[in-house]
Amino acid sequence: MSDYIIRGMAADGQVRFFAGTTKEIVETARSIHNTSPVATAALGRLLTAGALMGATCKNDSDLLTLQIQCSGPIGGLTVTADAHCNVKGYVNNPEVILHANDKGKLDVAKALDMGVLSVIKDIGLKEPYIGQTQLVSGEIAEDLTYYFATSEQIPTSVALGVLMEKNNTVKQAGGFIIQLMPFASEELISDLEKRLGEFTSITALLDQGMEPLDIVKQIFEGYNVEVTDTIPTKWHCNCSKERFSQAVISLGKKEIANLLADNKPIEVNCQFCNSSYTCLLYTSPSPRDRTRSR
């Protein structure tokens, strides 16, 4: 089945959830950027988060960007998503190689080390909303949990995972975001904290054949669960020759004049999908110029 996200409520509306499977998205990113296993895991987690957070957008035109600037060897990551859960992203150093951590897992935390997580939301206002928090672990899910608590004041649990095959392709990927509503009871909060504290690995459950809804129902066993939407999610880059041409036009007369003087093609590579675009600028000589050329 293709990647998708479910959105809904649980425990009589006291909790909202977003859960999804993103294997195809992460494998597409791995193939495009030729990422190492640890870079695939890091980028895959952030892409999954972007897709899930895209499902939280209120307007069709909303856009969000997740950006991590860090001191670790991975150099940083950027993911963008829209309200339709289309995502794209890249990692600054896709070739980073690290030993496994003491649990035998890909060491995403070491790849990131210290840094800052930025969440940029363009919701149609004059200026985008920008929320920033320090990385608390470098595992990305915990960093986003901290972001929601401190920057948006929403008690949230985030789980993200990428499971790799031995040949370094993506075996499973997915995640969930669970958020308490303001009127959630103390009894529910205590029970949910215990259940989430015992939760181990979302990719292990996906690898057992469970679907996102199965995982949500397992977490909320004994509570009612209502899915309100099922949203397809996919990798999508909206770069194009037309957008590239418009970017060149927007450079201004002085910059374009300098490019014309160089008399060389302009080459641009899209960081998100590695597509390359080439543009050759030229001018038609005026009558005076034609006279001089003779």
Residue ranges and their predicted role:
Residues 1-229:
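Interaction interfaces in information-processing and related assembly proteins
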Residues 230-235, 264-266:
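Short metal-coordination and nucleic-acid-contact micro-motifs, chiefly zinc-binding Cys/His arrays
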Residues 238-240, 274:
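Cys/His-coordinated zinc-binding microdomains
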Residues 243, 277:
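Cys/His-rich microdomains that often coordinate metals
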Residues 247-248, 280-281:
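Short Cys/His-rich "knuckle" micro-motifs
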Residues 250-260:
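A conserved acidic, glycine/proline-rich C-terminal tail/linker
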Residues 270:
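Short cysteine-rich clusters marking metal-coordination/redox-active sites
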Residues 282-291:
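Conserved small/polar residues in nucleotide/adenosyl-binding loops
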